[in-house]
UniProtKB/Swiss-Prot annotation:
Top-rank taxon: Eukaryota
Biased composition (Acidic residues): 11-46
Biased composition (Gly residues): 815-835
Family label: Belongs to the eIF-3 subunit C family.
Organism, scientific name: Phaeosphaeria nodorum (strain SN15 / ATCC MYA-4574 / FGSC 10173) (Glume blotch fungus)
The protein, known as: Eukaryotic translation initiation factor 3 subunit C
Domain PCI residue range list: 599-773
């Protein structure tokens, strides 16, 4: 408060206060004049410094009010350099206060003022940039980046003044900080080391400073360095000691500051690492590790989209240490439903034969490690060496999953702990989700490496060491355990994982029966989005398995729902496929990106499309040939997507050589419909994507056999009206099939009433029946009648829509109602005299407008 607004009414107090101010200002001005004789150009700065010095009197913390009387009695004269440093600190405090209330207009003004103060301080500091200034501009840049990222993720409306201020600060910081980038990088590498002044550590304090009533986080000030505990020299030459006796207090202070704004998480981590080094018993180590791992996970709560690899590996190592201590310390357990020890001054009494509970969750830690690894893989370019290097960390995570499962099993055995079954189910589910999509050889290697990291004395009851070499038994055991001990989403996901695994390993009939018996296709819409994605993946894998087994119809039927929608990427969570008229909010887009699967879990979409189009070709070409003689089949469409592509291809005047998968399939379709099965087989087998499939030569042989058979069917559908009899041997030589195979195909067509013929087995010939197939004239007549009936229905619907609501068009108020209610057009008894002054003619109503139209 200014002296002109003193609260006292006494004139004597006012006069004495004015004298005190004048004395202070005079002495400060004299000192400023003495110290700045060689710097005449800074007169304005010195005057502003004296004014700021007066203002700084009222910027002191609240805890210094009780000591104001002592300070007034012991005034210390400050040099111009100290005053300018005080001004710098005051400006930085104003910037920090404005950051707390998100006032970017004030930050912009104070940042300009800060930059004006820096050159003067650099001159007085022998050209060195003040470290306090570097700290301020580096922290401000971090806040600007965090705010900008938050605006991207969750846009929050700023007012116009704030928006202008934020944009101005952003541009200024970006441009200005380039000059000090080297110092900023040094500061960010190690903040404590950068801010530590060696001169201050060696020199004795020149003036007596007040003691803060608020102790610093996790530190104890000692006069001399001792051999007990961990001692660090902090800013100002003060020794900071960490002792075993103060560990619980430090942990309490760190936990209380978690989640607060502007808390230094890296400083907390360094403190916790030192506390772990000085801990002397297992209880302290467990408590420190629980807090340390949680604090590492807090690093990703800011602008970082995923946890850095170094931090992740440190968290993984600390989680391994935690499990090792818990495995060797049977009297201490970490469990979620435990009560926290409140007394920070002494350790809890842990007696032999009793179990002491510490609140925490091993399951949550391993789940968070899994989530952070997945999020990291989502953000790394999959075509770089960095992705492959990061993928190797999955082996470390899988080993931790196995150890966590063994530990949770040991807790489950003790009935007094009352561990919920859900905790064990979550670990088993995570382990199953890491093996269901991998080939057996990869899973076997992962299992072997994981069990090497587990002590020989430990074993799992759910998945013993004995079955680690048998991947099929492992997946079966994990799935069966979840079937028996879980329900809802976890049970459904376990079933889908097993279906996927069976289909991946060419066990089609088991996977199909399990899919049908689960009835998930009826209830999958009630599950969450991630489970629906897993259902789509399992369905697609079943379709691919059917294709590898040569079951074309079953494969096309399984892939139809996914591949026929043109949304394969979205349905399989392998990317965003923006539709032309779709409107998706930024929040929805962010959620969609979070659901994306890492690249190594993707199903090859090009292979998927190739399989779908090939199966559709083998089914649609014979059907299209059959339509010419069977009008009842005209409305039957197996694949609309394939029909649309085929029609587009046929409309092209000139078709060049095939370039991609679709071109190969379309030209093969054209050749197959013309009876050139060899050419069709060449087009299909020349598709390069088949090389990515296991046993590609076997797949190509299967496709050639399928094309031969469907080519035979297409030929018979097309040319049956032109034959009376046809020798089986002729067809066998034409399509390079055995006579037995030709007879089997023809018999099947006759039994399904697809072909009006009889098979003469004595003469080995096909006898076609005449009069059953429609002639060309009859086909055209039926087509004309169908079009005429469709035109009539369309006209009737149009008339009905236009005359809708005209049932009361002729009713008049006071009339007899109905069409015959009045005499003539005017209605009423008064002849043609209009009523109410309105001449409403026949053509004026809704029906009249319809007739006019």
């Amino acid at each position: 408060m200014s002296r002109f607004f003193a609260a006292s009414d006494s004139s004597s107090e006012e006069s004495s206060e004015e004298e005190l101010y004048s004395d202070n200002e005079a002495s400060a001005q004299e000192d400023s004049d003495k110290d700045s004789d060689d710097d005449d150009s800074d007169d304005d700065d010195s005057s502003s410094g004296s004014e700021a010095g007066g203002a700084n009197r009222f910027l002191k913390d609240a805890d210094s009010d009780s000591e104001s009387e002592d300070e007034d009695q012991n005034k210390v004269l400050k040099s111009a350099k100290d005053k300018r440093f005080d001004e710098l600190e005051a400006t930085i405090r104003l910037i920090e206060n404005a950051q707390r209330i998100n006032d970017w207009a004030v930050i912009s003004d104070q940042f300009d003022k800060l930059n004006r103060q820096a050159p003067t301080l650099m001159k007085q500091n022998d050209g060195k940039v003040p470290k306090l200034y570097i700290q301020a501009i580096a922290d401000l840049e971090t806040v600007v980046l965090e705010t900008h990222e938050k605006q991207k993720v969750t846009p929050k409306k700023m007012n116009a003044v704030n928006t202008r201020g934020f944009n101005a600060v952003r541009q200024k910081v970006k441009k200005h900080n380039r000059e000090f980038q080297k110092d900023i990088d040094l500061y960010r590498e190690n903040k404590d080391e950068f801010m530590r002044e060696t001169e201050e550590v060696e020199a004795a304090p020149k003036e007596k400073k007040k003691k803060s009533k608020i102790p610093q986080l996790g530190t104890e000030i000692v006069d001399e360095a001792t051999d007990d505990g961990f001692i660090t020299v902090g800013a100002g030459g003060k020794a900071v000691q960490y002792t075993p006796e103060g560990i619980l207090k430090h942990l309490r202070a760190i936990v209380e500051q978690r989640g607060r704004k502007n808390s230094d998480k890296l400083e907390h981590i360094r403190t916790l690492e030192k506390l772990f080094d000085v801990s002397v018993n297992d209880y302290q180590r467990i408590r420190v590790l629980l807090t340390l791992i949680s604090t590492r996970f807090d690093l990703t709560s800011g602008t970082a989209s995923h946890m850095h690899q170094d931090q992740w590996k440190l968290a993984d190592q600390e989680f391994g240490k935690l499990l090792e201590i818990l495995e060797n310390t049977k009297e201490i357990v970490v469990i979620e439903n435990a009560e926290e020890w409140e007394d920070d001054d002494k350790l809890p009494p842990i007696e032999e034969g009793q179990i002491f509970r510490i609140p925490g969750s091993v399951v949550s830690f391993v789940e968070r490690l899994d989530d952070e690894l997945t999020r990291s893989l989502q953000h790394i370019d999959p075509h770089t060496a960095e992705y492959v290097e990061r993928l190797t960390d999955e082996a470390l995570l899988y080993a931790q999953l196995v150890r966590a499962l063994i530990y949770v099993e040991s807790l489950k055995k003790n009935a007094s702990l009352e561990l919920p079954q859900e905790s064990l189910n979550r670990v088993v589910m995570r382990r199953l989700e890491h093996v269901y999509f991998k080939p057996s050889q990869v899973v076997t290697i992962m299992e072997a490496n994981s069990w090497k990291a587990v002590p020989e004395t430990l074993d799992s009851e759910v998945t013993p060491r004995a079955i680690s070499n048998d991947t099929t038994s492992l997946v079966q055991t994990l799935s069966t355990y979840l079937f028996q001990n879980s329900e809802g989403i976890i049970r459904a996901r376990a079933m889908l994982c097993q279906i996927y695994f069976l289909a991946l390993h060419d066990q089609y009939y088991k996977a199909r029966d399990m899919m049908l018996m689960s009835h998930l296709q009826e209830t999958i819409s009630n599950f969450d989005v991630n489970t629906q994605i897993l259902f789509n993946r399992a369905l697609v894998q079943v379709g691919l398995c059917a294709f590898r087994a040569g079951l074309v119809y079953e494969s096309q039927n399984s892939l139809q729902e996914i591949c026929g929608s043109n949304r394969q990427k979205e349905l399989l969570a392998q990317g965003l496929q923006m539709q032309r008229y779709s409107q998706i909010s930024p929040e929805q887009e962010r959620l969609e990106r979070q659901r994306q699967l890492p690249f190594h879990m993707h199903i090859n979409l090009e292979l998927l499309e190739c399989v779908y189009l090939t199966c559709s070709m083998l089914l649609e070409i014979p059907l299209l040939a059959q339509l010419g003689s069977s009008p009842d089949l005209r409305k039957r469409v197996i694949s609309k997507t394939y029909r649309r592509l085929l029609e587009y291809h046929e409309r092209q005047i000139f078709t060049g050589p095939p370039e991609n998968t679709r071109d190969h399939v379309m030209q093969a379709s054209k050749a197959l419909s013309a009876g050139e099965w060899k050419k069709a087989a060449e087009f299909i087998n020349s598709i390069k994507i088949w090389e990515l499939v296991a046993d590609s030569e076997k797949i190509k042989e299967m496709l050639s056999a399928q094309i031969q058979e469907e080519g035979l069917r297409t030929y018979l559908f097309t040319y049956a009206p032109y034959y009376d009899t046809l020798a089986v041997s002729t067809l066998a030589s034409m399509f390079e099939l055995s006579e037995r195979k030709v007879s089997a195909v023809v018999s099947k067509m006759i039994s399904h009433e697809e072909l009006a013929a009889a098979l003469d087995q004595v003469n080995s010939a096909i006898i076609f029946r005449k009069g059953v197939e429609l002639s060309r004239l009859q086909t055209l007549a039926l087509s004309l009648s169908d079009k005429a009936s469709g035109l009539i229905e369309s006209n009737e619907k149009t008339l009905e829509q236009r005359t809708q609501g005209t049932a009361n068009a002729f009713e008049r108020q006071g009339g007899r109602g109905g069409r015959g209610g009045g005499r003539g057009r005017g209605g009423g008894r008064g002849g043609g005299v209009p009523r109410g002054g309105r001449n409403q003619q026949f053509t004026g109503g809704a029906l009249g407008r319809a007739i006019q139209a």
